[in-house]
Amino acid sequence: MIGNARMSQKYPTSSSRKRSPLSSGKYSAIGLLAYCRPGFEAECAQELQNIASLQFVYGYSKIDKGTGVVFWRCSQGNPLDVYKEIEVSRCIFARQVFCALHDIEIEDTTDRVSPVVEALRPGGAFGFLHIETPLEDEAGSLQKLAKKLTAPMSAALRNAGVLSKAKTDELPQLHLVCLSGQHIIAALAVHPNSSALPLGIPRLRFRNEAPSRSALKIEEAFLTMLTPAEREFVLKRGQRGVDLGAAPGGWTWYMVTQGVKMTAVDHGALQQELLEDPAVTYVSDDGYVYKPQRKVDWVVCDIVDKPKRTMERMADWLCYDWTTYALFNLKLPMKTRMDEVEACLQRLQERLLGADIESEVRVKQLYHDREEVTVLALTGHFLTAFQKH
Ligand SMILES: C[S@@+](CC[C@H](N)C(=O)[O-])C[C@H]1O[C@@H](n2cnc3c(N)ncnc32)[C@H](O)[C@@H]1O
């Protein structure tokens, strides 16, 4: 069963969180709406179906390949029960997930407001309105439409009692997702089930001194795969780390900016400034052969190779106690991408359990990832500190 590997933790449930705004009204749902990397719609759809099946809720997905949008329509059970169990940061391929309430076809494009108000009037109330489009239309016409609709739609929804007078977190947020000028999906979002980021995308600023754009990838991983408290716990000044396949040095550079002393392993050339940095030791070696002389806090690995090979080597690092934490990318094949991720996670789980190592493994396709997913494996005191047993 695909999903984030839960070696010491079950899928997070809403019962462990504070009272959800979902309990404040009656919302009738038709499915789930998710955004993912364009081209990964099938994997995202499968992920939603897997989560739904755990709640004995079933449905089917409508996929337009290359759009980055998945509309999973429920055919049996309540999609709200599924949505309540989702935490988007724990999804692998979905970067945003909403609970879809209404699939609205606009017949008269001179009035898009009335059909939306009529559809939503009988349901529960919302604390904020977002009108958005996940689609990249070249002329930006959908973006313009979303912008133009915001003021009249907000006013009409407020008058109808659908939208609260002032913004509030006590109620779910309403997302009107424009898939075309004639097609709007009304969806509900609460956090952390849905991402608080617009379109689920973190907007990170690339710093010119970074040796490569890959620096954004590792920054996003730390930002989105850990809560602020977890991040503070696992990433500290004075730690030591190893970067396998480090050149030209984006990941090493990022770790050094966090105060971590790094050993950068690659046959390729590291950026000159990094070579001269006293916090960096460069080793020209094979990343699949290199072994640390003593245990480190972090191993990170961005080598482009077969995912199973990378996974085995990362399992070596964790099982032989060479590192406490590992962050690495699995480059996915063109086909059977889901199977590959599943097989790799299963293998890692077997290795860690075989070595009697308690761990928490998180997997995510980040916005800055391409044909790959990022894996974060956490062992040691992290598990007791955050009660993952
Ligand atoms: C995608 S790049 C890494 C980019 C790097 N993370 C950054 O932020 O700049 C992959 C690197 O892996 C290196 N590489 C490939 N196979 C390797 C191996 N077996 N051992 C060490 N490095 C390897 C390549 O030389 C290349 O520099």
Curated annotation (Swiss-Prot):
GO terms for molecular function: S-adenosylmethionine-dependent methyltransferase activity. It holds the Pfam family FtsJ. Keywords: Cytoplasm, Methyltransferase, rRNA processing, S-adenosyl-L-methionine, Transferase. It catalyses: cytidine(2498) in 23S rRNA + S-adenosyl-L-methionine = 2'-O-methylcytidine(2498) in 23S rRNA + S-adenosyl-L-homocysteine + H(+). One of its GO terms (biological process) is rRNA processing. It is found in: Cytoplasm. Transmembrane segments: none annotated. The active site is at K331 (proton acceptor). Residues 1-13 have a biased composition (Polar residues). The keyword S-adenosyl-L-methionine applies. Its EC number is 2.1.1.186. SUPFAM superfamilies: S-adenosyl-L-methionine-dependent methyltransferases. It comes from the Bacteria. Its main location: cytoplasm. InterPro entries: RlmM_FDX, RlmM_THUMP-like, RNA_MeTrfase_FtsJ_dom, rRNA_MeTrfase_M, SAM-dependent_MTases_sf. Residues 1-24 are annotated as: Disordered. GO terms for cellular component: cytoplasm. NCBIfam families: PRK11760.1 (NF008734). Belongs to the class I-like SAM-binding methyltransferase superfamily. RNA methyltransferase RlmE family. RlmM subfamily. Catalyzes the 2'-O-methylation at nucleotide C2498 in 23S rRNA. PANTHER family: RIBOSOMAL RNA LARGE SUBUNIT METHYLTRANSFERASE M (PTHR37524), RIBOSOMAL RNA METHYLTRANSFERASE FTSJ DOMAIN-CONTAINING PROTEIN (PTHR37524:SF2). Monomer. This is Ribosomal RNA large subunit methyltransferase M. It comes from Hahella chejuensis (strain KCTC 2396). The gene is rlmM.
